[in-house]
Amino acid sequence: MDEIVNIVRDSMWFIPNVFMDNGENDGHVSVNNVCHMYFAFFDVDTSSHLFKLVIKHCDLNKQLKCGMSPLHCYVMNTRFKPSVLKILLHNGVNNFDNKDNKGHIPLHHYLIYSLSIDNKVFDILTDPIDDFSKSSDLLLCYLRYKFNGRLNYYVLYKLLTKGSDPNCVDEDGLTSLHYYCKHISAFHESNYYKSKSYTKMRAEKRFIYTIINHGANINAVTKIGNTPLHTYLQQYTKHSPRVVYALLSRGADTRIRNNFDCTPIMEYIKNDCVTGHILIMLLNWHEQKYGKLQKEEGHHLLYLFIKHNQGYGSHAFNILRYLLDRFDIQKDEYYNTMTPLHTAFQNCNNNVASYLVYIGYDINLPTKDDKTVFDLVFENRNILFNAGVIHNIIHHRLKVSLPMIKSLFYKMLEFSPYDDYYVKKIIAYCILRDESFTELHSKFCLNEDYKSVFMKNISFDKIDSIIKKCNWDISRLKDIQISDTNLYTVLRTEDIRYRTYLKAIHLDSHISFPMYDDLIEQCHLSMERKSKLVDKVLNKLKSTIDGQSRLSYLPPEIIRNIITKLSDYHLNSMLYGKNHYKYYT
């Protein structure tokens, strides 16, 4: 034994506390733990002299006071070899169901530490055990530590059929089914396009049915109140409608609320990976089983979607339209004092907000407690750079009323000093639209108290400098004549009759307005797009107007003038009917 101890001690530079027998070994390799050290940390070579000494002189079934046996140790070894295990069995190792102080038998450690579960090794470790009723958490152990990778279904089914309890929970309250739902999401994401058979989720559905047949509680809740359906729908990956249906058909309750007061449907609608067909499936299933959702519930779903889903891609707009239509939510309808547009701007969801403005939501409508969208942005302390959000609002230009523009004068002091880029654009547009903006500033400049309030955020000097530059450019804009008006008026009105003049100015490299060049480009592009839409509508009208129509008595310029006043939304609706949303840009 001394030779074994010396060889192992010379090779060890650190001994984990777990191998210390309550201090008896005083941090050293001893005859009590040398066998455990060897099997835990050495690359065991069955032909080596040391291995032969260990087999001959060591008690291969000895347990330390922590409960660890040599078999526990070897199945944890990252250089585990099945051939060594077979030799250990041949030499009398038999403590397959002995537990360490954590309640783990050797099989626990093999399931946790093995990179790939070998079926033959698994059988060697499980066959001597009649059933797993005394180690009922084996299935949970395997899924908890391996849910991120490829699972071995032979292992899953054997653990389940030999008595591992599917309702065991970890310290967070997660059951085997919770972890399996996590596995499906993670593994589905990386394998979705690899094979057609995988996308049908046959193995996954079969195991869900089997684990429930063996007693798994489909509605077991974690410490934060999540059911397996909550858990599956919360994952930020692609979701399979087949898995959702498997859970629903076996009794998943869509009414259960977690500690955040969210049902599975609510959790799903908060997910950026939400898709329309699964959402429709969930809503239809819920209504068939528990009754029609009330409008208030529909409002809440829409609120959650806007708050948490940033509206990237056409699928997000499809879901937005679906919710608006399904629950018949009107443009001036409030939920908790706000319309959907207020919610969008309050949560910096510019994509959704832009679409809502496009379909006719009024950007100037106040909340029920008389707040503007500007107020909502400035009150939200989670918005670090509020000028960017305000710029997104005034980017809608003429849809923002003059009183709203005027109100921004009193909000300037709340801009962050790091928002120079957007602050310049905001002030430039305010001065263009509101002729009194500069006058107010000049008047307040005489008041020292006015200057001092800027100290907390953006400096007064910076604001003053921007306003002076804007005034200089405004005077130059007024000097440039365009037909019967000037460039200043064209930018204020965006009359598409002057689009060709604006295009010429935009393309002229010799003409520059540092504070307004970007706005000129935006107006030019907007007017070009609007002009093309108007032309398409007029062409369509020409093909449908006959001699009996009242429109046929109107001069073409009058018809054009009427059509020009329509919004892009109405023009697209005239052109494409119900498919107009496909042409939203």
Swiss-Prot record:
Supply the PROSITE patterns for this chain.
ANK_REP_REGION, ANK_REPEAT
Give the keywords, sorted.
ANK repeat, Repeat
Gene Ontology cellular component list: host cell nucleus
Per the record, the GO terms for biological process are:
symbiont-mediated suppression of host NF-kappaB cascade
Pfam families for the chain: Ank, PRANC
Q: Which InterPro entries match?
A: Ankyrin_rpt, Ankyrin_rpt-contain_sf, PRANC_domain
ANK repeats span which residues? 66-98, 172-220, 224-256, 297-333, 336-365
Task: Recall the GO molecular function terms of this protein's record.
Answer: protein sequestering activity
* Region of interest (PRANC/F-box-like), ranges: 554-571
* Family, as annotated: Belongs to the orthopoxvirus OPG003 family.
Q: What does this protein do?
A: May be involved in virus-host protein interaction through the ankyrin repeats and PRANC regions.
- Domains (record comment): Ankyrin repeats may mediate protein-protein interactions. PRANC (Pox proteins Repeats of ANkyrin, C-terminal) region is found on many poxvirus ankyrin proteins, and is related to F-box motifs involved in protein-protein interactions.
PANTHER family attached to this UniProt entry: ANKYRIN REPEAT AND PROTEIN KINASE DOMAIN-CONTAINING PROTEIN, ANKYRIN REPEAT-CONTAINING PROTEIN-RELATED
Return the protein name: Ankyrin repeat protein OPG003
- Species of origin reads Variola virus (isolate Human/India/Ind3/1967) (VARV)
Gene assigned in the entry: OPG003
